[in-house]
Amino acid sequence: VEAGEYLWANKKDEIFYDKQKKDHFMNHMFHGYDMDRTMLRIGAMNMMNHRVESPFIEYRDSLSDQNPDKDKYSLILANPPFKGSLDADIVSADLLKVCKTKKTELLFLALFVRMLKVGGRCACIVPDGVLFGSSKAHKDIRKEIVENQRLEAVISMPSGVFKPYAGVSTAILIFTKTGHGGTDKVWFYDMKADGRSLDDKRSEVKENDIQDIIASF
């Protein structure tokens, strides 16, 4: 939704006064997948309430062979489920080749690499364990992103940003799919505040690093 709102605010004349580009925005640009049918309905309704006439919102187990998408997307924005595990038998074999694991947070990163076009970018929220985990699977997915793709930024977020639902520490990874590496200088930012209190109430507060992150990146 925010990506669509950004395009409306900043690219309105370029997109919405061109028939072909407008059709792409309305009918082909935005894709979403979930295994919760209620969330699918909410997601589709939310997109339509924000000018997208026909969002492609589909029931799909993204980590299984049900998902054939490869080299398809130019941008992936994701907050995938983590702190969970799956039966390896239902996970797509090509993802397990990247990192053999049951941990969803690692498998989704492998999936995003596969789904991106070369030159496509991903901004993904991950638990801190992805950055510091010592298992072979953790090391394998970090190697994939750092050595085979181009890692551009790591934005560390305080542990309260997802309260009251979760208190885990998280970070945003931003990377570009290259297929041949290219990681050089990685931009790090330690976010201290996001404009809301870091307790269960999540009340508005003055401190907010988000605009500084946008301006500095």
Which residues does each predicted region cover?
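Conserved S-adenosyl-L-methionine
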Residues: 1-78, 83-85, 94, 102, ...
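A conserved structural/catalytic subdomain of Rossmann-like adenosyl-cofactor enzymes
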Residues: 64-217
